[in-house]
């Protein structure tokens, strides 16, 4: 299924493991991605007919020397297929590609763009031109459940093997027929591969990004793999590829061989060099002028946008607090007044001269929130007025100091109650239900009730504050994005937020919309119902909360999900309805998730009259305890810890 990678765990014997790999590995799905945000097609349309034609033509492909295929039907459907470098480019290769294509269209019905990696081949199709395009995202990586005994020695061996693979890939790049390398270091077996249509530099960049991420993906583990549309890497502690290819690998040419080649080629090559030296400077000058024009045009546009933003920010001068006033109000930011801390800074309680209690967020100089995020939070919050959103009183700027001044919420954040074994008893079912309803109404206001749609992008329990009646207020808008009503989705290369709450299409592809907030809301509701953190302890190894809840729901053991603290106070029908709403919100396909308008409507209706669609599997769904997917548990350097 989409966004799901599978990793073989350890078996009881080497013989059984080897048998399974050699017999079944070709048809094991490593990674499938359905680009839901890329659009759909309907049956009997031109795209549908051409895609079917392309799929049906695959068994008749003619074997190529490198197992790579670029296929296009009427320029409307474009596909790329590639067999692993150790697979003979014969009918076995074509059979794997055909199987992959059939699995892909079944997994991603009516989706315009999708890709799949099987053990021995990959296949992708789309409506756009992809030949020769290096695309390191979307990516997926998976690690073994088994840890190595000698982590330091294993890491050194793997590092040496990565260096060796890189050198072999560079040598393979010279042929431009196959960009593949495999190697063995002690008991570690590894391979790496790029699609042959990539340039030498693009292949090197693609694999360099993968190699740099290996410690994050698989540190101390006995195996792991990483796939993206353009390249692939895998390592194990058992032979999973044809070992004969390691002896056939082309090594970097020595200087002696290079000199011999130059002598053999003679004067014809010298003439070619003369021509190249004459043409290259002219082409470089032309390209330089083109790039300079584009750069100046973009800079002028950015300058205009920046000036507009600065003018809008200056219009908030009435909300500006004197820095000394805030410093005195917090007793010089005394530790005794500290009420919270996050990745962006520390929050203090304070009292203004008129007696008004305030909460002051003092942004850290080294925090992930820069001036842009600070201004975003100020500009957005000044436009928002809703009882379930925290109220911004103002801000203060002095040199490198940046302060945000909010209304003081006495009970701090939801997570401090929900996951505290003592305080959680204060949250009976009625209070938890009111929190769910309040957060849903706050999100609905952001998505549909404010001047422009706003996507929060970092909804989680620590960003939900509780007032004196334990009613919720959504806070922290530094990562929020504002849209116009005609365009409520976007793609970003900088993924920010908290991983366990991120929708799969956002975490893996950078695509976000109002449905990414819906996913985060679903995770939050599951935490409120169960009293458990997502990816927390007590769920079983390698299991996140949506998977844990889904498994109980399909097995008919949903009541086991209810926080034991609630057993005497919860309304069974109401809690089960909330569970189904949450599971609907964390579905893998964003188009199947309800809108917040639908969620509020379902929560506001009588429990007997609610019509809930049957939810499908959640994003990052883990099919078995025998398999592990590391995506929910990893922190990326691009993420801002909050």
UniProtKB/Swiss-Prot annotation:
Transmembrane segments: 275-295
EC top class, as a word: transferase
Domain called Gnk2-homologous: residue spans: 29-130, 136-240
Gene: CRK27
Modified residues (Phosphoserine): 462
Keyword match Thylakoid: no
Modified residues (Phosphothreonine): 498
Primary location class: membrane
Residues reported to bind ATP: 339-347, 361
Segments on the Cytoplasmic face: 296-642
Biological source species: Arabidopsis thaliana (Mouse-ear cress)
Matches recorded under CDD domains: Gnk2-like, STKc_IRAK
Signal peptide residue numbers: 1-24
Name listed for the protein in its UniProt record: Cysteine-rich receptor-like protein kinase 27
Molecular function per GO: ATP binding; protein serine kinase activity; protein serine/threonine kinase activity
Membrane topology value: Single-pass membrane protein
UniProt record similarity statement: Belongs to the protein kinase superfamily. Ser/Thr protein kinase family. CRK subfamily.
GO annotations of cellular component type: membrane
EC number(s) stated in the UniProt entry for this protein: 2.7.11.-
Subcellular location field: Membrane
Catalysis: reaction(s): L-seryl-[protein] + ATP = O-phospho-L-seryl-[protein] + ADP + H(+); L-threonyl-[protein] + ATP = O-phospho-L-threonyl-[protein] + ADP + H(+)
Glycosylation sites: 27, 40, 44, 70, 145, 173, 258
UniProt domain Protein kinase: residue ranges: 333-620
